[in-house]
From Swiss-Prot:
DNA-dependent RNA polymerase catalyzes the transcription of DNA into RNA using the four ribonucleoside triphosphates as substrates. It comes from Euglena gracilis. It comes from the Eukaryota. It catalyses: RNA(n) + a ribonucleoside 5'-triphosphate = RNA(n+1) + diphosphate. Belongs to the RNA polymerase alpha chain family. GO terms for molecular function: DNA-directed RNA polymerase activity; protein dimerization activity. GO terms for cellular component: chloroplast; DNA-directed RNA polymerase complex; mitochondrion. Its EC number is 2.7.7.6. InterPro entries: RBP11-like, RNApol_insert_sf. This is DNA-directed RNA polymerase subunit alpha. Keywords: Chloroplast, DNA-directed RNA polymerase, Nucleotidyltransferase, Plastid, Transcription, Transferase.
Length: 216
């Protein structure tokens, strides 16, 4: 498993945003150019423009040999799942997307996840329309522990109604070596105040699935 160590060197509240310098260590596990390219790409992406706004659960009882699905409220629990439906709903709403086709003029999509097998279901198991790309495809959503039911989950994905401006105002970085000749990066990141530079960086790491995060 790959780990990064992240140290906040300086953090400052500006009149029109936030500024932070932080050091990222333990880069020996990565191709440096690839890591930099991925982080820059995810920091500068419009990660918040598309969101899951509604999650609906449909269940059928496999023991009754019926194909009829019934709506289940997300405040209920199902003993065939390890997680509650409310917890699963929250995990769905953390997923982030990118619009792949600039010619698409709509402002909403629908996606579906069919859960028949007994297994861990990941965000990559969701069936999306071709215009939409999932950015965090390895997130664990829930675990199904019984064949007694089949679960169908319908997702509504919408664009934000308000105009969105990217929170990143400035991004600079350098790669250096310490006294042990280990590579590390210094990030100079300024945001517009809607998100702190450190949280923006963490969100980029989580969306890119490059590493597992831990406290230094």
């Amino acid at each position: 498993m790959k780990y990064l160590k992240i140290y906040v060197l300086r953090s400052r509240l500006l009149k029109d945003g936030n500024l932070a310098f932080f050091k990222v260590k333990n880069l020996q596990f990565f191709d440096k150019n690839f890591f930099v390219t991925e982080i820059r790409r995810y920091l500068l992406l419009d990660l918040e423009s598309w969101n899951i706004t509604n999650v609906m659960f449909f269940v059928t009882n496999n023991l009754k040999n019926t194909s009829t699905f019934h709506v289940v409220h997300n405040f209920l629990g199902l003993e065939e799942l390890k997680q509650s439906l409310l917890e699963i709903t929250k995990k769905f709403k953390l997923l982030r997307f990118k619009l792949c086709s600039k010619s698409y003029q709509g402002n909403k999509f629908f996606a579906v996840l069919n859960a028949f097998e007994v297994k861990d279901f990941l965000s990559g198991d969701i069936i999306f329309p071709p215009h939409l790309k999932l950015l965090n495809s390895r997130e664990l959503l829930f675990t199904k522990i019984s064949f007694n039911i089949t679960l169908k989950i319908l997702l509504k994905i919408e664009a934000k109604k308000a105009s969105f401006q990217k929170p990143i105002k400035r991004l600079n970085l350098i790669i250096e070596k310490d006294e042990f000749f280990d590579n590390y990066m210094i990030f100079d990141l300024t945001t517009d105040g809607s998100v702190t530079p450190f949280n923006a960086f963490i969100k980029a790491l989580q969306s890119s699935n490059l590493v597992t995060l831990t406290n230094a």
